Design a protein with these regions (language model features):
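Active-site helix of classical SDR
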Residues: 123, 160, 168
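Residue(s) in the substrate-gating loop at a strand-loop-helix junction
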Residues: 144
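Alpha-helical segment proximal to the catalytic Tyr-Lys
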Residues: 128, 173-177, 264
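Short, small/polar-rich loop/turn modules that mediate ligand/substrate recognition or access, typified
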Residues: 89, 176, 181, 266-268
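Canonical Rossmann dinucleotide-binding motif of NAD(H)/NADP(H)-dependent dehydrogenases/reductases
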Residues: 3-34
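Substrate-binding pocket helix/loop in short-chain dehydrogenase/reductase
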Residues: 99-112, 236
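C-terminal substrate-recognition "lid" of short-chain dehydrogenase/reductases
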Residues: 4, 82, 120, 242-273, ...
Length: 313
């Protein structure tokens, strides 16, 4: 009883080197042919190369998810090339930003636009293609823990991820009559595990941001006397019951299963792979990581990356 996506064709939007690339790789490793979109053509091509060096089949379909003609264009390209589309992962998003006192209208507008039109236009045109061709497809929107609860310093992100969550439930109702499923997956600050990303940016996987871009949530970015801190900066208690919120590989396993026929009746739902982080009551502080048994070993997907890393050690 193996989960298999053999014969299925997937489109993953925003297939940048972290979560998008991880999901695209997972879909390929489970047998799907994958079309990797990104507004950054190099990011899309890099995701394709990662899939190919792991033995999968992929093409790059660069484009802006907010541009309807471009969405229709890359959908057509995928259909001409592979004859069908069974899976859509709406992953593209603008991360970061600032708090409500400091965010600019331009950033807020664009961040909301990428999430809103990205999810809408891709779900509309690819869902319509699936419906017209009798394909009982699976659509997965990538949300965030910030879509379910509040953090300081990410007001645009909180707004659009909250929107994504109910978009999924409504789109699930629209597409249920066609046998097409719509669900969300909620990442919770996974630890990057793409070897190329780590080689380029270090273990955290993020480029060091200038002070001015660090959230604007309190005294850190402003010297005004009225500013108050919004984030605890002292020693941190353990936050995650199982000690880790996992990696993009963990996300990929879950999304691949969600796109398989095993989940044929799952629609309008949200999934987390977060070591219990979201289930935790606010007043409960988990044990220290060193005292935990830890999760079962990760089943790796980037096999050549693992081998390369072992060889270079
Ligand atoms: N990294 C995290 O800790 C985290 C946590 C929770 C949720 N998420 C979500 O996971 C997803 C991926 O996050 P990530 O960490 O890999 O971020 P990322 O910034 O590395 O990837 C997002 C990609 O989307 C692309 N993109 C942006 N605008 C686009 C557009 N208009 N058209 C096409 N592509 C566009 C970017 O170029 C980028 O490659 C996002 O939806 C994000 O909100 C991430």
């Amino acid at each position: 009883m193996d989960v298999s996506l053999a014969g299925k064709v997937a489109i993953v939007t925003g297939a940048g080197p972290n979560i998008g690339s991880g999901i695209a790789l997972a879909l390929a490793k489970y047998g799907a042919t994958v079309a990797c979109n990104d507004i950054d053509a190099d990011a899309a091509k890099t995701a394709v190369k990662r899939i190919e060096r792991n033995g999968g089949t992929a093409i790059a379909i660069p484009g802006d998810v907010t541009d309807e003609e471009q969405v229709k264009g890359y959908l057509q390209e995928v259909v001409e090339r592979f004859g069908r589309v069974d899976i859509l992962v709406n992953n593209a998003a603008l991360l970061g930003g600032k708090g409500v006192l400091d965010e600019s209208a331009d950033f807020f507008r664009r961040a909301v636009e990428v999430a809103a039109l990205g999810n809408f236009l891709n779900t509309k045109h690819i869902g319509r293609y699936m419906a017209e061709h009798g394909i009982r497809g699976s659509i997965v929107a990538i949300s965030s823990s910030n879509g379910w609860s509040g953090s300081a310093g990410v007001i645009a992100y909180a707004f659009h991820k909250g929107g994504v969550n109910n978009f999924v439930r409504a789109a699930a109702m629209d597409l249920a009559p066609y046998g097409i499923r719509v669900n969300s997956f909620t990442p919770t600050a996974p630890t990057p595990d793409n070897p190329e990303l780590i080689a380029e940016r270090g273990a955290g996987g993020v480029l060091e941001r200038p002070q001015a871009f660090r959230h604007g949530i309190g005294g850190a970015t402003g010297t005004e006397s009225w500013r108050r801190p919004a984030r605890w900066t002292g020693e941190r208690m353990p936050l995650v019951p199982m000690g880790t919120t996992g990696t993009p590989t963990d996300i990929g396993h879950c999304v691949a299963w969600l796109c398989s026929d095993y989940s044929r009746l799952i629609t309008g739902c949200d999934f987390v792979v977060d070591g219990g982080a979201r289930a935790k009551n606010f007043a409960y502080a988990p044990a220290a990581v060193a005292d935990l048994a830890g999760p079962a070993p990760l089943v790796p997907l980037d096999v050549t990356g693992e081998l390369d890393r072992e060889l270079s050690m």
